[in-house]
A protein has these predicted regions:
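Feature marking well-ordered beta-strand scaffolds used for ligand recognition
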Residues: 1-275
Length: 275
């Protein structure tokens, strides 16, 4: 069976508006091959009208879905009967998750954005959450942690390959970018923060920061016939091996011991870009 989570947009006529009004609804469809064609054999009712899907995850006979408009409805789905998928539980919390990662049978680790329920830009941050789904009808956000300022972002929020969970040690590494307006120094890049943030994940103790491996001083140089430009790229990927973690940007890579991320052991800078 193929399971697909979709946001459906319908355009409806609206008095005084020549373009009409767009209405959204969300659903999970189960598809199977019948008579040589792929057909929908089961489908949930429309969910969270007026919102759109930000993330989904299917694990065995269970499914998880996150939609968003102002708060984050987190849905649990029973997919044991492909022809009759059902919503079992729902949890509403501020913000939204953009990637869902199973930790074990009863816990999910997510990354996304915290959004102030009152609206506005201030108060936003990267959000890590640990969900308890042992009671499938009543999921709980067991732990959460806000990371960074309103300017913060992480490539892991929109590319799951940047989300690096190392289950043997219970460690999570994610790229982190922020803007520190209070930083001293001249020029734009003195306030730019590019790091690999590392967290310890424990289903009983929660989410604990282990520190950051900074890449802010690893610059990429672009050379042109009449001028040269250097800039600090964001962290794109990471690798964890034994007691070491590697941070990778478009400008180079750096390694540190996880026990002391503030003391890099080696930095390799890539060659400047030639025209």
């Amino acid at each position: 069976y193929l399971r697909v989570a979709t946001t459906v947009v319908r355009h409806e006529e609206s008095a005084g508006d020549p373009w009409g009004r767009a209405e959204t609804a969300n659903r999970v469809s189960v598809m199977a091959e019948e008579d040589g064609a792929l057909k929908v054999v089961g489908q949930t009712p429309d969910l969270a009208q007026g919102e759109r899907i930000f993330s989904s995850r299917f694990v065995g006979r269970r499914g998880f879905l996150v939609t968003f408009r102002q708060v984050d409805p987190f849905f649990t789905l029973d997919l044991s009967n492909p022809r009759d998928p059902k919503v079992v539980g729902e949890l509403k919390i501020p913000g939204f998750s953009t990637y869902i990662h199973p930790v074990d049978e009863n816990h999910l680790l997510t990354i996304g954005s915290y959004v102030n329920p009152d609206g506005g830009w201030q108060g936003r941050a990267i959000k890590l959450s640990l969900f308890d789904v042992s009671d499938f009808a009543a999921p709980k956000e067991k732990f959460s942690q806000l990371v960074g300022s309103s300017y913060a972002s992480s490539e892991a929020q929109y590319d799951h390959r940047a989300f690096n969970y190392f289950p043997e040690k219970g460690l999570l590494a994610v790229p982190f970018v922020d803007w520190n307006a209070a930083a001293s120094g001249d020029g734009y890049w003195s306030s730019f923060v590019s790091e690999l943030r590392v967290f310890h994940i424990d289903t009983q103790a929660g989410i604990t920061g282990r520190g950051a491996l900074s890449m802010s001083d690893v610059y990429r140089t672009e050379r042109y016939p009449d001028w040269t430009y250097s800039w600090s790229p964001q962290v794109r990927r990471s690798v964890m091996a034994d007691d070491f973690v590697y941070a990778v940007t478009d400008a180079g890579l750096r390694v540190a011991n996880i026990a002391d991320l503030s003391a890099p052991l080696k930095t390799v800078r890539f060659e400047p870009n030639a025209p």
